[in-house]
C-alpha cells in the first residue's frame, strides 16, 4: 500500500517565473529608445569625423535626435516614466527616418 501511495506522489509544478509589471516594461521601452538615440548620435559623430558631411550638418542631425529624445521623455512623463507600445512604435518610426538621413 505504501509503495503504491509513494508512486502517486508527484513533485509539485515549479511556480511560473514572475512576469515583469507593466511599469517595468514601459521603463525598458524608454531605455531602448534612449539607447537607439545614443547609437545614432555616435554614428553622426563618426560620419562628421570621417568627413562624410560637414559639422553644421552633423549639428542639425544631432538636434533632430535631441528633439526625438525630448518627445520620448515628455511622453514618458505622462505615464510615470515609461512608454506605451504605441508611443515606442511612433518614436522608432521617427528614428528610422533619422537613421536614413544619417546614412544608415
Name every feature range the model reports, one short phrase each.
Residues 2-26:
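Bacterial Sec signal peptide processing site at the extreme N-terminus
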Residues 27-31, 42-93, 97-100, 104:
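Surface-exposed, polar/charged faces of alpha-helical domains
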